[in-house]
UniProtKB/Swiss-Prot annotation:
Gene3D superfamilies: 1.10.1420.10, DNA repair protein MutS, domain I, MutS, connector domain, P-loop containing nucleotide triphosphate hydrolases. This is DNA mismatch repair protein MutS. GO terms for biological process: mismatch repair. NCBIfam families: mutS1, PRK05399.1. PANTHER family: DNA MISMATCH REPAIR PROTEIN MSH1, MITOCHONDRIAL, DNA MISMATCH REPAIR PROTEIN MUTS FAMILY MEMBER. SUPFAM superfamilies: DNA repair protein MutS, domain I (SSF55271), DNA repair protein MutS, domain II (SSF53150), DNA repair protein MutS, domain III (SSF48334), P-loop containing nucleoside triphosphate hydrolases (SSF52540). This protein is involved in the repair of mismatches in DNA. It is possible that it carries out the mismatch recognition step. This protein has a weak ATPase activity. The gene is mutS. It comes from Listeria monocytogenes serotype 4a (strain HCC23). It holds the Pfam family MutS_II. It comes from the Bacteria. The keyword DNA repair applies. InterPro entries: DNA_mismatch_repair_MutS, DNA_mismatch_repair_MutS-lik_N, DNA_mismatch_repair_MutS/MSH, DNA_mismatch_repair_MutS_C, DNA_mismatch_repair_MutS_clamp, DNA_mismatch_repair_MutS_core, DNA_mismatch_repair_MutS_N, DNA_mismatch_repair_MutS_sf. One of its GO terms (molecular function) is ATP binding.
Length: 860
């Protein structure tokens, strides 16, 4: 049996409690890792792997990082989804006999990051917990430890519902019991980018009972308890900044599943996975970090409460009407610090003097923001202004205590203002007077000895000294100077007077720094008493910031205030896709109308590829979302219903994370919409059925349209390449054909991007293939096949009485190129098309002659 050294034994005992984390084990000035941790960390962090004697025949794998620069390495591990247990020496090695006691003082995980460098300013960092109650419902709680936010709800015990909540929040970590983790699918565990933490205890800690209200359900309380207990156990410190748990109902907001939000690119682009090109990117002109985080929350959860939507619209209208006041408001907001995260760092004891300066400067802005809002003489903005708490007593205390030029370090002095504490002033005077005496001593000694290069210096090892070059040492009087240090070209001395004064100066400086640190911690503790008020203030400032952002974006982009319809109708005149318009420029974008009501529930959209069908569909959805977050919308006029849900199946960026085919993903998304949609929902289906055989796809597309028409009655935009489906307009009274127009000019297709009534007459798919520069022989072959199909074309739409109007005869297409039938009309048409597509202006006379011979040979 291996007999490890005492230090390795201690390491292994602690590591056994934190098997799912990298253990940063403090040894002197380094955090060391051993065994498997060392092997893995050396690769991930790209640091040197070494070995250490530990009682085994071979050296134990070891790697380490300096403690003073460990935060960067920790951030790297956390970003990759790992956990880090910080193990510190909790005894002074100088006063301890034998092995120094060590303990884990904090477990840092993706959901518990507090260091600013590991957080994104305008993104929350959520950790969530789950409690499954009898397999019927999930208690669900989440928190952003950096801001103190704590919320909870109850959702259906469905993995889809759980995924929706987790992805809406961009959750970094999920706490579950071992049995709960067991039943979650591999998709949940491996593909959502979550760190799973197993924790069994779900009782609410006594000190946190005040955070939970009585009316919450058992499953909700257990989820909160699991979250709070985990945070208490891993953070090992006061979490007094956690706010009272707020219950929320998902039914109070517009519902959009993960796929819908992804397809609409609300907060993350499909291709770049960043904010660029998203609705959030467009609407975000917030000036504060906390305002940016609130804006994302608003976009993730649009309102369905008519009064709340109108309230936001009123505020945006008032801010737009007061241009100069809004500019002043923006300037004030620019100087407001991240109050939410500051409160969290205060609770953690991580705040420094510069944080307090920024807090003070932020509080200076509050009366100015309040005065600006009141000057607009708006009832709604006055209510917002009156919610702003300037925390005047705290502002005065910070002004009185903290120097404007305070350093980051809180243990080296220079933080507290003169006049704040009389004892500190006494120490400082002693130190300053002593340094004046030192300067005077240097002058006197030079005069006494005649050594003009003599100087008085200081270092931490020898204290104050008199330095004389070796060439001048013979000028020193004997008996008065005591040699302390010999250098290459100089000697250093002390005198009795210098030694006595040194003690007075150093004692004063040491006591000054000790007292200054004590005074700083007292001020920091005082700020703790204001945490709750600062959090409420942060929420009010964030709301004001979001509203001014809406006003600014609406004005710059010529958005208009939408009307909310009572009858469920949707009428948009000259609507635009807000993001595409921003990227392309307003002059290049083609605006379009959209009309839907109880008698016109489904728009069947046909038109060429690349013509803008998908953009048009997204445009309608984004207009609705803009309206329901309280912003104005990109249109000349707009009357919109309040949608309870939006379902989409748009684009080709299929998410095959579960190993499903494109067609299976299509059908699952279609099922989700059909099962959950109501008459107040919006459905966007783009090319449903494209993932299977033509007849299968067409049959399913028709059946889905009919089912929505007869049973769901949701507002629906359904694009298709199955032109045969346009005959459904005769069968379904609530369906209307529209198309995206295109024209042919000189044999080339020109997309007009304009929506018109009625079905499209052609697809122009082969023209799109030409634009993609497919081989010419392939294009010609496709044209011949198309001609064959068009010559044999019959309708295949099946009426609701299940009797076929006409059944398409099967066409066996040759696997090899075959010559088309010799039909004069067809040949003439082809020749005319070829002649029309010729670019005569770029032909040389010889090219033209050769082309003429080629055409003549085709005729013969």
């Amino acid at each position: 049996m291996t007999e490890y050294t005492p230090m390795i034994k201690q390491y292994l005992e602690i590591k056994d409690k934190y098997q799912d984390a990298f253990l940063f084990f403090r040894l002197g000035d380094f955090y060391e890792m051993f065994f498997e941790d060392a092997l893995n960390a050396s690769q991930i962090l790209e640091i040197t792997l070494t070995g250490r004697e530990g009682g085994t025949k071979e050296k134990i794998p070891m790697c380490g990082v300096p403690y003073h620069s460990a935060s960067g390495y920790i951030d790297t591990l956390i970003e990759k989804g790992y956990k880090v247990a910080i193990c510190e020496q909790v005894e002074d090695p100088k006063t301890t006999k034998g092995m120094v006691k060590r303990e884990v003082v904090q477990l840092i995980s993706p959901g518990t990051v507090m260091d600013e460098r590991g957080l994104k300013a305008k993104e929350n960092n959520y950790i969530a917990s789950l409690y499954c109650y009898e397999g019927k419902e999930y208690g669900f709680a989440y928190s952003d430890l950096s801001t103190g936010e704590l919320k909870s709800t109850v959702i259906e015990a469905s993995e889809d519902r759980l995924i929706n909540e987790l992805t809406t929040l961009s959750t970094r970590e999920l706490i579950v019991s071992a049995s709960e983790k067991e039943v979650l699918s591999d998709v949940m565990k491996e593909q959502l980018g979550l760190t799973f933490s197993v924790h069994e205890e779900d009782t609410i800690p006594l000190e946190n009972e005040k955070l939970v209200t009585r009316h919450m359900s058992l499953s909700e309380k257990r989820a909160i308890g699991k979250l709070l207990h985990y945070l208490k156990e891993t953070q090992k410190r006061d979490l007094g900044h956690l706010q009272q748990a707020v219950h929320y109902e998902t039914s109070n907001y517009m519902k959009m599943d993960y796929y819908s939000k992804r397809n609409l690119e609300l907060a993350e682009s499909i291709r770049g996975k960043g904010r660029q090109g998203t609705l959030l990117w467009l609407l975000d002109n917030t000036q504060t970090a906390m305002g940016g985080r609130m804006l994302k929350q608003w976009i993730d959860r649009p309102l369905i409460d008519r009064n709340k939507i109108i309230e936001r619209q009123n505020d945006v209208s008032e801010l737009m009407a007061n241009f100069f006041e809004r500019l002043e408001l923006v300037e004030n907001l620019k100087n407001v610090y991240d109050l939410e995260r500051l409160a969290g760092r205060v609770a953690y004891g991580n705040v420094n003097a510069r944080d307090l300066i920024q807090l003070r400067n932020s509080l200076y802005q509050i009366p100015r923001i309040r005065a600006t809002l009141l000057s607009m003489n708006s009832k709604s903005l006055t209510e917002l202004a009156n919610q702003l708490d300037p925390c005047e007593e705290l502002t005065e205390k910070l002004e009185e205590a903290i120097m404007d030029s305070a350093p980051i370090s809180i243990r080296e002095g220079g933080i507290i203002k003169d006049g704040y504490n009389s004892q500190l002033d006494t120490y400082r005077d002693a130190s300053r007077n002593g340094k004046t005496w030192i300067a005077e001593l240097e002058r006197k000694e030079r005069e006494l000895t005649g050594i003009k290069t003599m100087k008085v210096g200081f270092n931490r090892v020898f204290g104050y000294y008199i330095e004389v070059t070796r060439a001048n040492t013979h000028l020193l009087p004997e008996g008065r100077y005591e040699r302390k240090q010999t250098l290459t070209n100089a000697e250093r001395y002390i005198t009795p007077e210098l030694k006595e004064k040194e003690k007075l100066i150093l004692d004063a400086e040491e006591k000054s720094m000790e007292l200054e640190y004590q005074l700083f911690t007292e001020v920091r503790e005082l700020v703790k008493d204001y945490i709750e008020r600062l959090q409420k203030l942060a929420k009010s400032v964030s709301e004001i910031d979001c509203l001014q952002s809406f006003a600014d974006i609406s004005e710059k982009n010529h958005f208009i205030r939408p009307t909310l319809s009572e009858d469920g109708s949707l009428h948009v005149k000259q609507g635009r896709h807000p993001v595409v318009e921003k990227v392309m420029g307003a002059q290049s974008y083609v605006a379009n109308d959209c009309d839907l009501d109880r008698n016109r529930e489904i728009l069947l959209i046909t038109g060429p590829n690349m013509s803008g069908k998908s953009t048009y569909m997204r445009q309608v959805a984004l207009t609705a979302i803009c309206a329901q977050v309280g912003c104005f919308v990109p249109a000349e006029e707009a009357t919109l219903p309040i949608f309870d849900q939006i379902f989409t199946r748009i684009g080709a960026a299929d998410d095959l994370i579960a190993g499903q085919s494109t067609f299976m993903v299509e059908m699952l998304e279609a099922r989700n919409a059909i099962v959950h949609a109501t008459k107040d929902s919006l459905i966007l289906f783009d090319e449903i059925g494209r993932g299977t055989a033509t007849y299968d796809g067409m049959a399913l597309a028709q059946a889905i349209i009919e089912y929505i028409h007869e049973n769901v009655h949701a507002k629906t935009l359904f694009s298709t390449h199955y032109h045969e489906l346009t005959d459904l307009e005769k069968e379904l009274h609530g369906l209307q054909n529209i198309h995206v127009s295109a024209v042919e000019e000189n044999g080339k297709v020109v997309f007009l991007h304009k929506i018109k009534e009625g079905p499209a007459d052609k697809s122009y798919g082969i023209h799109v293939a030409e634009l993609a520069e497919l081989p010419k022989s392939l294009i010609e072959r496709a044209s011949r096949i198309l001609e064959q199909l068009e010559n044999d074309d019959k309708k295949i739409v099946i009426t609701n009485d299940k009797q076929p109007e006409e059944i398409h005869e099967e066409v066996q297409l040759s696997m090899f190129p075959v010559e088309p039938e010799k039909k004069a009309s067809s040949k003439e048409t082809k020749l005319l098309k070829e002649i029309a597509s010729m670019n005569i202006m770029q032909m040389t006379p010889m090219d033209a002659m050769n082309k003429l011979y080629e055409l003549q040979s085709k005729i013969h």
